[in-house]
């Protein structure tokens, strides 16, 4: 999921 990638970046 793209959301997972965004959470990791944050």
From Swiss-Prot:
The UniProt record lists the keyword Ribonucleoprotein: no
Tissue expr: Expressed by the venom gland.
Compartments reported by the entry: Secreted
Record's GO cellular component terms: extracellular region
GO MF terms, alphabetically ordered: toxin activity
Record-given protein name: Toxin To83
Keyword Secreted annotated: yes
Keyword terms, alphabetized: Secreted, Toxin
Disulfide bridges in this chain: none
Organism for this UniProt entry: Tityus obscurus
